[in-house]
Amino acid sequence: MTDPVTLPDLLAMKRRGEKIACLTAYDASSAALQDEAGIEVILVGDSLGNVIQGQPTTLSVTLDHMVYHTACVQRAARRALVLADLPFLSYCTPEQAVRSAARLIRDGGAQVVKLEGGRERLDVVRFLTEQNVPVCGHLGLQPQAIHRLGRYALQGRDAESACRMVEDARQLAEAGAMLLVLECIPWELAQEITAAVDIPTIGIGAGRHCDGQVLVWQDMLGMSARLPRFCKDFLAGNAGVREAVSAYVREVKAGIFPGDRHSFGRDGP
């Protein structure tokens, strides 16, 4: 069996220019399929609020929910690195964040925890890093901020917000973050951030120039009633789910996905 994927492996992949394939999973059977297909990172996302619980946002997801689903995924992930979201209001202070992370790691089996936010989260990222908790940042569209944002929309299109996001990325990396998710931002901005930091970037709706890509499992299989523009139905044209996951891995690795039709430009629609 191939050795388990580690954070140093992902850093080495960035240096080599090798793309990282990531998908969300919330249960053991999905995680097993992804693991067998060569997915390097499985994200147990708070998106389970949308696609598993049927909620309109991720805000109702609790730490107990995240621990349960992370444990389900971890049992089946023999090779892939397991990354788990810290849910809404579970990391308001460094002390609360480390307690929440302890549950995801001890009880859920996560290897990395993800949190949303930029410079306002630096104290939390530093404290977690000091306690040897690996952290993944999340910039761009932040679903946990939906009530402040008003709607799910492209972020970082204007010069001021783009410059702020680049600086946020640098500061998160300096504070100790080891991965960075970039969601729904112009591909030009994602390319700039990816070049500005030494840690791997994983994009969703952020173009092909990120170090890796992630999609929500249900979106990748075309199960959602309305697919976001940045998604592709990989089940269409393939014989089954296993083949669809393999196709996703191949296209990410080859730099085929995401294509222009799945990306946003600064001056585009």
From Swiss-Prot:
Location of the active site: 183
Cofactor(s) listed in the protein's UniProt record: Mg(2+)
Co-factor: note: Binds 1 Mg(2+) ion per subunit.
N-terminal signal peptide: none
GO CC annotations, alphabetized: cytoplasm
EC number(s) reported in the record: 2.1.2.11
Catalytically driven reaction(s): 3-methyl-2-oxobutanoate + (6R)-5,10-methylene-5,6,7,8-tetrahydrofolate + H2O = 2-dehydropantoate + (6S)-5,6,7,8-tetrahydrofolate
Keyword Transferase among record annotations: yes
Amino acids binding 3-methyl-2-oxobutanoate: 46-47, 85, 114
CDD domains linked: KPHMT-like (cd06557)
Intracellular or extracellular location(s): Cytoplasm
Top-level enzyme category: transferase
GO BP: pantothenate biosynthetic process
GO molecular function: 3-methyl-2-oxobutanoate hydroxymethyltransferase activity; magnesium ion binding
Binding site for Mg(2+): 46, 85, 116
Keyword terms: Cytoplasm, Magnesium, Metal-binding, Pantothenate biosynthesis, Transferase
Pathway participation: Cofactor biosynthesis; (R)-pantothenate biosynthesis; (R)-pantoate from 3-methyl-2-oxobutanoate: step 1/2
InterPro entries associated with the record: Pantoate_hydroxy_MeTrfase, Pyrv/PenolPyrv_kinase-like_dom, Pyrv_kinase-like_dom_sf
Subunit structure: Homodecamer; pentamer of dimers.
Stored HAMAP family: PanB (MF_00156)
Record's function text: Catalyzes the reversible reaction in which hydroxymethyl group from 5,10-methylenetetrahydrofolate is transferred onto alpha-ketoisovalerate to form ketopantoate.
Similarity remark: Belongs to the PanB family.
Protein name in UniProt: 3-methyl-2-oxobutanoate hydroxymethyltransferase
Source organism of the structure: Methylococcus capsulatus (strain ATCC 33009 / NCIMB 11132 / Bath)
